[in-house]
Amino acid sequence: MIKSAVHPLLASLPPTYYSIPLKNPPSRSFNRFFCHSSSSSSSSSSSKNNNVKKSVQDPYFPPRFSVAPMMDWTDNHYRTLARLISKHAWLYTEMVVAETIVHKQDNLDRFLSFPREQHPIALQIGGSNLNNLSKAAALANSYNYDAINLNCGCPSGKVAGHGCFGARLMLNPKFVAEAMSAIAENCDAPVSVKCRIGVDDHDSYSELCDFVYKVASGSPTRHFIVHARKALLNGISPAANRKIPPLKYEYFFGLLRDFPSLQFTMNGGVTCINEVDAAIQCGAHGVMVGRAAYNK
């Protein structure tokens, strides 16, 4: 899909929206990608108890290939299997709600521990309460995740509806910037945002740029994982939200051009390694695969 479509998309990019420097842009080349080889140790004890050295180096480069955080899929068992298959792919946890971390401090290992062999691994958290997001990041810090990601893309009714977080956070970029600042202040790992290209009728390229600009200029966030579909918050299922909204890769490649000091990982509709390679060749800093990582 991507291999045949991505070059025409590049030729039809939207007009430049924000080609302005961000506050304190990182001074590093994006031609290089960080690649970490997992530990050869056979120990299965948690990273909290073993003071595992982090796989992320300074400066931080986004992973070239990663497996998306997926509820009911990317648990410890799946990640163990995935790590046996690939030593270099970045793995993500299922989303863990900030309140769960804060209110389950007597049983944090259940939600946050992982075998050291799973490095490099990122924790995805969700929430809309600044205080709880701060506390959750601080509590997770001792588990030595390689990155922490904020969920701004989940469209499910339970998350974006009653929970008022996930994709709904895209409607409030000021809050997202504050949340990312709070998370970054309470952890040692790099931080990132996973988002859609829009929400409901707020789906123009200029609105997407406004979100990215406000979050990046108001927080330490320099890495965005962009699912190239908008989210529909009209009650349809998460599965339908992965199929009904059309993919708009031109939005993703527009961000690459208009925000040269930021890092962008492409997500959505990627089904094979040839499509991953095509996206990288066309400038994507990284590619995240979701359903294809368990369907094939």
Over which residues does each language-model region extend?
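N-terminal chloroplast transit peptides
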Residues: 1-23
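Flavin-dependent oxidoreductase catalytic cores
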Residues: 9, 13, 30-38, 46-296
